């Protein structure tokens, strides 16, 4: 434990909390051509690459992902949730925060049912998370 004199000289330094989704905390002013510190819950971007990757050790699958260039100029890797998707290069997507635990470097999710991303077909439960409309009653 420090002495009173050591605390008077140096003092306690509080920890700085870093964001888990830093690309959502940057904006871009295209008129002034400068980056701004504007936080937003989602951001729009254009897919530059769509593909699959394999998860970390105990799991085995082909997880769908997209490399997305956001409106603030930052390029991030985002996970495509749900079964099947219609994304390809140059698709305009909406990104939200939220990492995928077994995919290293994937800190963002693509919002299904927004912009060019279609909702998941034939989904009955948890539809709001996958952008699926309510099925018609027969």
From Swiss-Prot:
Q: Where is this region: Disordered?
A: 33-55
Please indicate which superkingdom the organism of origin belongs to.
Answer: Bacteria
Q: Does the keyword Nucleus apply?
A: no
Presence of the UniProt keyword Repressor in the record = no
Which parts of the sequence carry 3-methylthioaspartic acid? 102
- Output one GO MF annotation: structural constituent of ribosome
Q: Which HAMAP family match?
A: Ribosomal_uS12_B
What are the record keywords, sorted?
A: Methylation, Ribonucleoprotein, Ribosomal protein, RNA-binding, rRNA-binding, tRNA-binding
Fetch the CDD domains from UniProt.
Ribosomal_S12 (cd03368)
InterPro entries annotated for this entry? NA-bd_OB-fold, Ribosomal_uS12, Ribosomal_uS12_bac
Q: Which PROSITE patterns has this protein been placed in?
A: RIBOSOMAL_S12
According to its UniProt record, which protein family does this protein belong to? Answer: Belongs to the universal ribosomal protein uS12 family.
Its biological purpose? With S4 and S5 plays an important role in translational accuracy.
What does the record list as GO biological process? translation
Subunit structure and binding partners: Part of the 30S ribosomal subunit. Contacts proteins S8 and S17. May interact with IF1 in the 30S initiation complex.
Task: Please state what the protein is called.
Answer: Small ribosomal subunit protein uS12
**Its GO CC terms?**
small ribosomal subunit
């Amino acid at each position: 434990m420090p002495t009173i004199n050591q605390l008077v000289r140096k003092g306690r330094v509080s920890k700085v909390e870093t964001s888990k989704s830093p690309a959502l905390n940057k904006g871009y002013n295209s008129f002034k051509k400068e980056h701004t510190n504007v936080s937003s819950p989602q951001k729009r971007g254009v897919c530059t690459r769509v593909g699959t990757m394999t998860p970390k050790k105990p799991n085995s699958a082909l997880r769908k992902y997209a490399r997305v260039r956001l409106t603030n100029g930052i390029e991030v890797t985002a996970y495509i949730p749900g079964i099947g998707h219609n994304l390809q290069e140059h698709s305009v997507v909406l990104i939200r925060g939220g990492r995928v635990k077994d995919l290293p470097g994937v800190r963002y999710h693509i919002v299904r049912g927004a912009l060019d991303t279609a909702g998941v077909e034939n989904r009955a439960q948890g539809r709001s998370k996958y952008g699926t409309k309510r099925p018609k009653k027969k």
